[in-house]
């Protein structure tokens, strides 16, 4: 269990979590409904939640730039737009369930979302709204993980929760390739960076290290958002021995 009361979290989830591999739908009704239910449970537990959502279910910037005749900058910008599409879907679904929320965009899209402002976003969280942050870091060559870490620092969250669909934490090597890969319950920021481990962008880890924000990486196929906040699941990246948040 956690040592301290968690009051504010940044939940980073991939766009892939919204899609169903068995369907051609980019956004699965079942997956979206599950996400809404998870957010409602956590909000009802008096935890303030900001969400950073990826766009990989619609388009991946780097892979698209390699496969199509599109330069990297344009491809990354297209990927950022994909996160806005997912954010709009999430915002509307939350509204349908009477969950107050604020949809924000790092880049100006006034007809679609409010321009992200740290103070306004923090105020919205304090008012019980789910804050949805789209467009990543707002610049090419920077991942959505890095954008999530930036938002986590600005909003002064207690923990950054990164949900994945393929692994249940940080391993010493890729568990999908090596059956004997070992999962860490806890690893320090510096050890994560010095060992060149994957699963989360090192730039994001560096930002969280500077701000002293722990990161919990967990499997969204195995665990709920509530479990990631209140129980010991996945891997904690922090400076605290033992992985306590």
Curated annotation (Swiss-Prot):
Inhibited by UTP. UMP binds at residues 55, 76, 137-144. It catalyses: UMP + ATP = UDP + ADP. It is an enzyme of class 2 (transferase). Signal peptide: none annotated. It comes from the Bacteria. Belongs to the UMP kinase family. HAMAP family: PyrH_B (MF_01220_B). This is Uridylate kinase. The gene is pyrH.
């Amino acid at each position: 269990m956690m040592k301290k009361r968690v009051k504010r979290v940044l939940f980073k989830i991939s766009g892939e979590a919204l899609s169903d591999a068995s369907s051609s739908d980019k956004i699965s009704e079942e997956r979206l409904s599950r996400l809404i239910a998870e957010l409602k449970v956590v909000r009802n537990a008096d935890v303030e939640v900001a969400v950073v959502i990826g766009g990989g279910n619609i388009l991946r910037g780097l892979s698209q730039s390699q496969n199509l005749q599109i330069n990297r900058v344009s491809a990354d910008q297209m990927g950022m737009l994909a996160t806005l599409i997912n954010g709009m879907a999430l915002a509307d679904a939350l509204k349908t369930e009477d969950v107050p929320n604020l949809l924000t965009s790092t880049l100006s899209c006034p007809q679609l979302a409010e321009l992200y402002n740290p103070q306004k976003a923090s105020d919205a969280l304090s008012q019980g709204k789910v804050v949805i942050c789209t467009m990543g870091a707002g610049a090419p060559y920077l991942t959505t993980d890095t954008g999530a870490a930036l938002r986590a620092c600005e909003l002064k969250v207690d923990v950054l929760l990164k949900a994945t669909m393929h692994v249940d934490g940080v391993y010493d090597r890729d568990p999908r390739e090596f059956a004997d890969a070992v999962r860490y319950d806890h690893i320090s920021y510096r050890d994560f960076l010095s060992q060149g481990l994957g699963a989360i962008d090192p730039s994001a880890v560096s930002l969280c290290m500077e701000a002293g924000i722990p990161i919990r990486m967990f499997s969204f196929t195995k665990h709920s958002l509530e479990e990631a906040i209140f129980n010991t699941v996945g891997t904690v990246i922090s400076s605290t021995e033992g992985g306590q948040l």
